[in-house]
UniProtKB/Swiss-Prot annotation:
Subunit composition and interactions: Homotetramer.
Gene name of this polypeptide: fbp2
Residues holding Mg(2+) 2: 111, 114, 274
GO BP, one annotated term: gluconeogenesis
Protein name: Fructose-1,6-bisphosphatase class 1 2
Pathway the protein takes part in: Carbohydrate biosynthesis; Calvin cycle
Species name: Bradyrhizobium sp. (strain BTAi1 / ATCC BAA-1182)
Known catalytic reactions: beta-D-fructose 1,6-bisphosphate + H2O = beta-D-fructose 6-phosphate + phosphate
Binding site for substrate: 114-117, 202
Binding of Mg(2+) 1, residues: 92, 111, 113
MF (Gene Ontology): fructose 1,6-bisphosphate 1-phosphatase activity; magnesium ion binding
Species lineage: Bacteria, Pseudomonadati, Pseudomonadota, Alphaproteobacteria, Hyphomicrobiales
HAMAP family the record matches: FBPase_class1
Length: 347
């Protein structure tokens, strides 16, 4: 069970990392990211006044339309990381990794502003990062499996500005104190609540899903009268950091599967700087993360911006989805195919 820290006893991020004897290089990178996140939180707060929530008429390395604040966030994060012990940086906003100091011990993969399309709707957005050891060269460092990560985390810019940090096999929550302007420890040792009957998926894409995913969602929607024997709530925020935060606080399962649309057949989220860090956080908080067929942390990227499906959350609920995929040919079996017509977990 997570320990809650009263405000008057809460150590700062820097102090807590020192108390936990965190690796000095990792700590320096995390503190650099926190410095950038403080400024980014301020920029997000004034985005409608400064026009930062508008499009920048450009696309990033992966073909996504950029907001002006995407570029601001990328510059803030990379500028901060250049002052830390970092050999290379892989950002969602650039095509290839940037070499900073080839002799430094760490590399960082980052999505500087995840969910920026939500800015105009005043929905939480965030920064996701993965810290990993430098390999034989900067590029190859990002092609190691997710198990190689030294630390990972995400900032949430919402009602509070928070940092969820996975380091040394634990997950802690820090909140940006509005007066001190420091991240202070709010909860340590986060554990995902078990057996919460909630699932998150974008149901508008149902027609594009595999038969397996449709069958899983149908079983949840059938409720207490269906094969799963209980009522489920469905959630969808369309913000990866907000979805992950909710799972850490409430439990349940999040699904962003591959589907039949062009550009989605291998999943939509990026493996190195979205799925890998989220998987590390989930596992170290007692949960699980899968592609539906494989443990996310065991997957290795073949290209910097490779995509992957992501199912994460409560171990039991993730396992349920994995079991539905067993014996099913990848990847878009149809629900009216004879062998898989009504493959369900309970029949």
């Amino acid at each position: 069970m997570a320990r809650e820290w009263p405000m008057e006893q809460s150590p700062t991020l820097q102090a807590h990392l020192a108390l936990q004897n965190a690796d000095a290089d990792c700590a320096a990178v995390i503190e650099a990211l926190a410095d950038a996140a403080r400024e980014l939180a301020r920029q997000i707060a004034i985005a409608p006044l400064a026009g930062f929530d508008e499009g920048a008429a450009t696309v990033n390395a992966d073909g996504d339309v950029q907001k002006a604040l995407d570029i601001v966030a990328d510059n803030l994060m990379r500028d901060a990381l250049r002052k830390a012990p970092v050999a290379g940086i892989l950002s969602e906003e650039v095509d290839r990794p940037e070499t900073v100091n080839a002799a430094a011990p760490l590399c960082v993969a980052i999505d500087p502003l995840d969910g920026s399309s939500n800015l105009q709707n005043n929905i939480s957005v965030g920064t996701i990062f993965s810290i990993r050891p430098r390999g034989r060269d900067v590029l190859s460092s990002f092609f190691e499996p997710g198990t190689a990560q030294r630390a990972a985390g995400f900032f949430v810019y919402g009602p509070q500005t928070c940092l969820v940090l996975a380091i040394d096999h634990r997950v802690d929550l820090y909140v940006l104190h509005p007066t001190l302007r420091e991240f202070v420890l709010a909860r340590s040792g986060l554990r995902i609540p078990q057996d919460t009957p909630e699932f998150a998926i974008n149901a508008s894409n149902r027609r594009h899903w595999s038969g397996t995913v449709r069958n899983y969602v149908d079983e949840c929607l059938a409720g207490a009268a269906g094969p799963r024997g209980r009522d489920f709530n469905m959630r969808w925020i369309a913000s990866l950091v907000a979805e992950a935060y909710r799972i850490l606080m409430r439990g349940g399962v999040f699904l962003y599967p591959a589907d039949s649309r062009p550009g989605y057949r291998e999943g939509r989220l990026r493996l190195v700087y979205e799925a890998h860090p989220m998987a590390l956080i989930m596992e170290w908080a007692g949960g699980s993360a899968s592609s539906g067929r494989s443990r996310i942390l065991e997957l290795s990227a073949r290209s910097p911006h490779q995509r992957a499906p992501l199912i994460m959350g409560d171990v039991r609920l993730v396992r349920d989805v994995d079991q539905l995929h067993e014996g099913v040919e990848p990847l878009f079996e149809t629900s009216d195919a004879p062998l898989f017509a009504r493959r369900g977990l309970f029949r």
